[in-house]
Structures are given as structure tokens and as C-alpha cells.
UniProtKB/Swiss-Prot annotation:
The lineage of its organism: Bacteria, Pseudomonadati, Thermodesulfobacteriota, Desulfobacteria, Desulfobacterales. GO terms for molecular function: amino acid binding; aspartate carbamoyltransferase activity. It catalyses: carbamoyl phosphate + L-aspartate = N-carbamoyl-L-aspartate + phosphate + H(+). PANTHER family: ASPARTATE CARBAMOYLTRANSFERASE, ORNITHINE CARBAMOYLTRANSFERASE, MITOCHONDRIAL. It comes from Desulforapulum autotrophicum (strain ATCC 43914 / DSM 3382 / VKM B-1955 / HRM2) (Desulfobacterium autotrophicum). This is Aspartate carbamoyltransferase catalytic subunit. It is an enzyme of class 2 (transferase). It comes from the Bacteria. HAMAP family: Asp_carb_tr (MF_00001). L-aspartate binds at K86, R169, R223. One of its GO terms (cellular component) is cytosol. PROSITE patterns: CARBAMOYLTRANSFERASE (PS00097). The keyword Transferase applies. NCBIfam families: asp_carb_tr (TIGR00670), PRK00856.1 (NF002032). Belongs to the aspartate/ornithine carbamoyltransferase superfamily. ATCase family.
Amino acid sequence: MRFEHKDILDMESLSVQDITMILDTAEGMKEISKRPVKKVPTLRGKTIVLLFQEPSTRTKSSFDIAAKRLSADSISLSKSTSSIVKGETLIDTARNLEAMNPDIIVLRHPSSGAPHLIAKHVNASVINAGDGIHAHPSQTLLDLMSVREKKGELQGLNISIVGDISHSRVARSNITGFTKMGANVTISAPATMIPRGIEALGCKVAPDMDSCIENADVIIMLRIQKERQENILFPTEREYAALFGLNAQRLKLAKPDVIVMHPGPLNRGVEISNQVADGRNSVILDQVTNGVAVRMALFYLVAGGSRNADTI
């Protein structure tokens, strides 16, 4: 079965079958990363442009490593090294890149909808690496992979998401992705950090963190995104940590085999304690590992792959 999407822009456009195909393919890709020689010729001759207009550590390096492990040629452009700083529009940048015939453009941008706009103006496949507060599909896919690895299935799991929901593209994509795969999603945050109408995405809003994480199978913690906040949304970090921080005592409210996740970067001592972040329930580093596998799968599939990666 051939993957039918030219672009990966959000979780809404992916069906359950699409998501399952991506996760199955990523499992095969993960095996490649365990080999002594972590490279296959699958995308030799393909060119991938990483156009990142916001700071990134994990996502950018993960996409870059994914491209190289598939033998693609990758070029990395940041805001400071592109002509955008000279006043060039994003569309003009994309058209100029298109003139060089890349196969895939990976875009991170501070404006919601930017990858959708670019996808309309280029023939290359576009993968959204995070756009404003809108979406971060590859993060959700690696989260789904991490949960499926640990729990065996996604259907019926209780997923708790706690933190700055209003400014989090990860929260929006995860709510959509996990509910689409049959999980039950409950969120919690200060009232100033919960967007109006978020329930329309299929989640429940808990009155406080304790009730949110009670009997949870998975807890996803989110950092406070101060860089996107125009006003002060809580009194102090200490008060926030007391009400919405995940510590060892609060973790006991969840199921004994709960897994704790975080998209990074972590603000230790604020939304998550050192003991929890580094404890036995944490799968935060597994998420990073799976991020490479998922992004390898996305490159492979949008480039025309039609099966899982077991024989690559």
C-alpha cells in the first residue's frame, strides 16, 4: 500500500491507517539506528532542505540525522542565514528553493499555517516541523510510537496532558492524534492557559491537576512557553510548580505503570521534578530516540515508500 500524502502538515489530515503505516514503518527504521553502520542508501540522490525559522535542538538535529541515515543530502537554513533577514518573503524563499529542485522541505515557522502556505507554492513535499501554536505532527507521531512501544496499544488508554495548553502546538496535535487512535485525553492547566473551546478537539478539561492525572496511563508534561505569552499568566514559578508541577508524590495518583513524557526542553523544578524526569516512569529519552525513527519514516514515505522498513 502506497502512502498517498505529498505533505505532512497536521494530524487532522492523517487517517488512522496513515498513522499506523507511519508507526509501523518507523519501527523498521529504528532497527537501522541500532546497527553498527547506521546508514542505508534508501534516499540516495534525494535533497532535503531544513528551513528553521525558530530555535530548535531536538527537532532540527533529529530531522538532520534522519536524512543522513537514509543517505539523503540535507542542507540546513536558519533565520539568521537565510535572506528572510533581508526582507525576503517566505513565499519568495520557498520559490527560490523550489527552483533548485529539492525533494523535501522541512519547515519550522513562528506563524501558524506557514507550512500549508508553502505547500501550495512548491512541488517538493513539505513537512511541518512546528508552526506557531498550531501543529507539530512529527512530535505527536513520535509520542504515539513511544506509547505504543510501552503499552502495546493506544485504544482506551487514559492520556493526561498538563501545562501551557494555550501556547502549545504539541498539545493541539497530541489531542487530535491520541483521540483519533482511540485514547481518552484529559488536560489541565491554569485557567489562563486553557484556550476557549479546546474541548471541540475531543478532550476533557479537568478542574485541577490531581484529578487530571488520577488513573492515568500516560502523563505528558508541557513547559510554560514564555516566549509566546504577551501577558503574565501566573503569579510565580513556585506557585505554578505547587499547583501544576509533577513530582514523585503527585505521580502516585496515576497508575503504577504510568509513563511520563515531555517534548522538551524541560524546565526542571517547574513543570517536572528531577526525580520524576530521571525516574523509572520517564520515557523522555525514548521519545528522542523514536523521533529519529519517525522522521526517517516520514522522509521515506513522502518520497514514495509503499511498505514498512523491515527489509531496508
